[in-house]
Every structure is written in structure tokens, then in C-alpha cells.
Swiss-Prot record:
It comes from Bos taurus. One of its GO terms (cellular component) is dendrite. Residues 572-597, 602-637, 652-672 form the EF-hand domain. The gene is CAPN2. The lineage of its organism: Eukaryota, Metazoa, Chordata, Craniata, Vertebrata. Ca(2+) 2 binds at Q229, K230. This is Calpain-2 catalytic subunit.
Amino acid sequence: MAGIAAKLAKDREAAEGLGSHERAVKYLNQDYAALRDECLEAGALFQDPSFPALPSSLGFKELGPYSSKTRGIEWKRPTEICDNPQFITGGATRTDICQGALGDCWLLAAIASLTLNEEILARVVPLDQSFQENYAGIFHFQFWQYGEWVEVVVDDRLPTKDGELLFVHSAEGSEFWSALLEKAYAKINGCYEALSGGATTEGFEDFTGGIAEWYELRKAPPNLFRIIQKALQKGSLLGCSIDITSAADSEAITFQKLVKGHAYSVTGAEEVESRGSLQKLIRIRNPWGEVEWTGQWNDNCPNWNTVDPEVRETLTRQHEDGEFWMSFNDFLRHYSRLEICNLTPDTLTSDSYKKWKLTKMDGNWRRGSTAGGCRNYPNTFWMNPQYLIKLEEEDEDQEDGESGCTFLVGLIQKHRRRQRKMGEDMHTIGFGIYEVPEELTGQTNIHLSKKFFLTTRARERSDTFINLREVLNRFKLPPGEYIVVPSTFEPNKDGDFCIRVFSEKKADYQVVDDEIEANIDEIDISEDDIDDGFRRLFAQLAGEDAEISAFELQTILRRVLAKRQDIKSDGFSIETCKIMVDMLDSDGSGKLGLKEFYILWTKIQKYQKIYREIDVDRSGTMNSYEMRKALEEAGFKMPCQLHQVIVARFADDDLIIDFDNFVRCLIRLETLFRIFKQLDPENTGMIQLDLISWLSFSVL
């Protein structure tokens, strides 16, 4: 219940703009300005109680409290490390980012790329911070986290060993923005050790809010040059690098003056006519301008003399230091990897860019209800969340003569780094894309069934299921309606996720799910219509007062179920029996008369029949995945969110729902639907309750 209330509150806040860059969510409700002012007024330096200068903030295993790697560590403020500490001096440069004793080179590569764009850097690292003016030992940074911007506050106590920073540091040792940025990122992920191992694209996304894709250039798709051109037109950040094979290879310079393991940026892609044929050229920037390419199409290459002078002048006059052209074929031959971070429309302030259209959907997998696993598990795969995407407009320019709608799909699992301290790690995740059959187009209130997936192949799917934070692929499909089904590889893995779709043209989306529906059988009977046999049975069971209490009902039903071999049951709990009596006790006596007992008896017989039919393995019990079908047979259709609540409430640790809990669930549902209908005679779908009414119904 608390989780549902929190989600509703969060959705309302998001609708009001909370989570945008301008109104970032305050992580752990820490307000930077208020905390800084408190410290300044008190004349004290900030000490962060939520990320203390203790071993728990370092790690849990390799950097755990008893690890040899953490012995002798002291937490010091920059003012204790050097004489004249600076937050940032002369802009952000590569020399500000030197790796320490932590395997987070993926993060540092992303930070290095961040330094190439001052506007985006300023969003993540507010530059109006210093160790002089209004210094209170507190700093703040902003990160994108699964669809919202989050402001993270840290104190400036940093882990040191032998007087030197243990982790990220500047080459000069006096600039601290990168070390404090790393600390803030460690805080939001639980500890420093949680940052060990990752993909640069993860850092790209958390610093920009974009969606990052990468290409192994030895397996480059045939249209990669056009992909690069379009990405540049959309203001995307593009980086490339040459793989290293050993630590000694790092920063090694090739004979044509390219640096291995070095982060380059791609800044241009043009086709020029040379010697009667078109040449594809790529412009690359070495952000630190130390060495430049000496191969074909370098600044002094005679190839430029074969190009129209006006074109040559246009392409070469805007050169920055460290920027050079090379042929696309040489690019594919010499570089190993290309990363493209496609930025969201709100990140791009210039109107000159052709902006992507962004769609984001949140969801979760819950053990026993919506965590169905991949297609290898056909009995449960259909239980996964399902999302509809409508592609309506084809791309403006159709490359390679292929028409269709280009879009990227990224599936991100949330908060998994933070859970490493609890022994958890990344799930293996992926997704499939299915074309909606013609007879179902235009409908959004149907959760596609097991039969559909048994008889329908995926139109597209993620390249692989992988245990990274995100799996992402680029697709091109004809206009139409498609269902995206995200899943973990194995079923019953709890997790939260978000799906983002970047499309060249606007794409509509929505969750595909069953609408709430209740078709409750009305048993309309008078006492005169009840047969004599049932009357005699009731007289024997009810005793002298001719009524049956909840306690008497429990005894009766235990005897009945004890005779059945096809349903495993220890009888009904007194709670279930009280719920049954409450639903049918029209006169408020707390007991059931003849007619009321007849109606209950009829319902229980119906529930027994459903329970037996759904129990296909004849185990005498029902697993939680069978519950959805059982509820439909009983007349109830509900969305995934309610199925998650039902499984959490009525299934045991082994995801078994026994007959007692099955009946209790159905009785409670029927009671709640009847109450709602009584209070909403006009079928508006809304009711108003005062506090006492809400509490009265809630304790049912």
C-alpha cells in the first residue's frame, strides 16, 4: 500500500514539472542552498550524514571495512590536502581526470567526453562553486536518473592514502571538481565500489539524459556514415577510440599519430568529389590537441588539391586545434569503437538541430506476477509488461532506398548498482517487438495472451540478452502498431525499469493492459426456491438459532474440504470466514441465514470448479501465474499493477496460492466492487470518501 501511494504522489509531482533540469529532485531530500546557509550561519563545515566519511561509503568487498586496500585511509578536505585548492580552473580539461585505485575508467571516459561540451558540463557540474566564496564544505551536482534529473549533495571529505587522493584526481593535484563529481556519483549508487566496471554509455546517459548507442567498427552496419551524419544534425555527442590490448598500450601513439585508449570526438561527416568520385570524410577532434593524424586527408595532404576550392575552404577554415579530416574507410580501419549519445530535445538549446522525438515508459517486473522471463518460458512470458508504440510517419529522407520509421529502443534496469551492497547485481535483460495483428489494431485494453506469443514471431528483438544496465538497439520498421515486451532472461526476477524510444518522427505510445472489469454473477433467489435437501442440511449445521457464525462456518468448510482429494487445503482461516460473512450479512447480525448461506455455498462450489480447472498440473494448488486466468474465469479483469498487489498479498514464499487465499481474494474483490458500485451509481469511475469512510472500508 505504501509503495502504491508513493508512486501516485511521484506521478503527480512529475506532472507538475518535478524532475526536470530546472526543478531537479533533491536526492534524499537534501537541499543544497539551505544546508550551505545553515553551515555558513553556524560557522561550521558540512558533514553529510547520508554518505559519511566511513568505510561503508567506500565499499563492501574489495573496498570493504576489512579489506587490505582500505587500511590507512584518511578522509580529508581539499583544504587539508593542498595550500590553495580550486574547484575548477581554466575550464575542464583531460588533466583534471586521472584514474585512481578504482575500476571506473568507463566513468572517467564519459567525464572526459563531458568536458568537450561546456553547456552540458555546466548542467552536471554547477561552476559557481569554490573553496573561497561562501565555502561551507558542501558541493552539489546533477545527474539524470531513469527519466528525471536529481541533485546530489556531498561534503568535500575525500578518501586519501599517504596524503594523496585515493580515487580520481587532477594531474596538478590542486583541482577538485572531478573528485567531488565522482564522490556524488558514488553516493547516488551506494558507495565507491559500486562504480567498479561499466560501460561508457552509462556515464554518457547519466550526464546528459540522452540515449547512447555504440558500434564495433569492424562490424559497422552499411549505413553507418549516414547514421553519423544524422546524429550530427541532431546535435548528438559522438566519441571514438582505439582499443588497447594491455596497460602498456594505453596512450601509445601509432605511426600515423593516433593515440590508443584515447577519447576522440567526431565533429563532422561530409562527402566531397575528388578525382571524379565521391569520397566520404570524417572530421575528428583530439580534444587536447597534442597530436594529429598524418595519413590520407590530413591538413597537409595533397588530396585536398583535387577538391573544389570553395568546398576545400568551407571544410578547412573552421579547424580547431587538434581537429583533422580522414577518409571514412581509414576511420573504420584504424578506430575500434564509435559511441553516439543522442540528446533529448530539452538538452539542445539551439533551433538549428533536427531534434529526436522522445517517449519514456516506466514499469517493473515482480516475482510471481509480471516477471515472466524471456521467450524460453512460454507459460509465463506473456505475463511481462507490454507497451504499444504507434509509428505513423516515415523518415523524411530514406537512406539506401529503404522506406520506414527509424527509432531507437533502450531498456534500462534501475538502481542495480545501488543494490550491489546487498549482494545483488545486474539482471540479464532484453526485449522483443511484435507487430499488432490487424484485428487488434486500435485497441489498448487487451494484454496479449499466451496463445498470441505461442503463434507469433517477434518482428524485431534486442541483439542479445545481457547483464548490463541498458540494452539498446536501432530499428527501422514500416508505419504501424507494435508491442514492445521487456523481460529478464529468467522469470521471477524482481526489478524496476524504464523504456525509452527515440524516433525521427513523433511516435505515440501507451501501456497495453486489461481494463478493470467485474462481471459478478447475481444469485437472485428467495427462501421459497431453496430445495428441501439444502434446508435440512442448513438446519443440521446452523443449530437452534438457525444462523451460522464465522466460527461455525470455519468448522463446516473444514469438514467439506477434508473430503476432497483434488484440492490441498487445511481448511479456511477465521479471517476468510469473517470476510465471507461480512459480504453476505445483509441484516448486520454477524451471521448467515438460510438464503445467505445458500448464496455463499453456490459461490464456493463455483470457486472450487475454477480452482480445479486452472490447476493444469493437478498439484491440488495454484501458482501465482495461474491466478490471472483464474480471476478472469471468476469474472474479474485487472491490469498488471493490481495483479502485482494480489500476488504480494495472497501468494506464499513459493508463489503458491492455496484455496483459502484464492477464495479470500475473490470475496474481497467482489465486496470492494459492490461497495464502489453502490457509491458510484452513475458509473463515473470516481468516488469521494471522508477519512472515516476510507478507514472503515480499508480494514475490510
